[in-house]
Amino acid sequence: MHLNAWQELRVVGVEDGGFFREPSGSAAQKALFVCVLLHGNWIEDFQVDEITVDGLDASKKLVSMLHHWAFHAVMLAGVSFAGFNLVDPTLVFEEFGKPVVIVSRTKPDNVAVKNALLRHFEDWQIRWGIFERLGPIHEVSIINEVPLYVEVVGEDIEWTNELIRASAACCRIPEPIRVARLIARGLTRKAR
C-alpha cells in the first residue's frame, strides 16, 4: 500500500485501559475501552466507554461505538480486552463489511488461552468459539523491528501486511492502535 493510499484511509484503533483485580464478590469491575478514528496519521475522533472485566460486553460496545463513524478498517490490539472480555472480529466484520485486523506484539498462544478459559469460565465454549473462527496467525516484519503477529477477517494477508507497514509511523505498532493505547492508558492513570 502506497503511503498516499494510507493517508486516504480511515482506520479505527481499539485498545483498553488497565485495571486492578478486586477481591472475589466485589461489584463487577470496569475498564476503559477506547476507539480512535484516524484519517491517515491524523486523529479525526475518539470515543471512550467502559467494559466489564472478564465480561462479554466488548463486542456489543464496539459495534455501538463504530456505528457513529464511516471507516475502511478496524485494528484491534488483540481480541482480549479487560481480562477475557473478547471482541468477536467475525461479528464486527459481518456488521460493517469492513476488514478487522487483530494485532499482537507477541505470538498468541492459543493452547494457553484455551486452558485458561477452561479453568476460569463456565461459558468457555462461547469465548473459545471466537478464537476458533479466526484465521491463521501471520508474522509481519517492520524494518529493524521485532515482528508483529496478525490475524485478519475480511481481507487477505497481503493487503493486511501493506496496511500494517504503512500505518506504523513511528514504531512497529500501527498508529491507530498506538494512539488508542496512549489515550486508554493515560485516562486510566488519571482516574486512579
What are these language model-derived features?
Residues M1, V48-E50, S59-V63, K114-N115, ...:
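Charge-biased, low-complexity intrinsically disordered regions
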Residues M1-S26:
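Two-metal-ion RNase H-like nuclease active-site motif
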Residues W6, K30, V53, D57-K61, ...:
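Conserved active-site and cofactor/substrate-binding residues in soluble primary-metabolism enzymes
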Residues G17-F20, G78-V87, T106-D109, E155-E158:
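Gly/Ser/Thr-rich loops at beta-strand to alpha-helix junctions
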Residues A27-A82:
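A glycine-rich, hydrophobic loop/mini-helix early in the fold
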Residues H67-V100, S104:
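Ordered, amphipathic secondary-structure segments that act as subunit-interaction surfaces
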Residues P89-P147:
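Long, charge-dense
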Residues V152-R192:
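Charge-patterned, long linear interaction tracts outside catalytic cores
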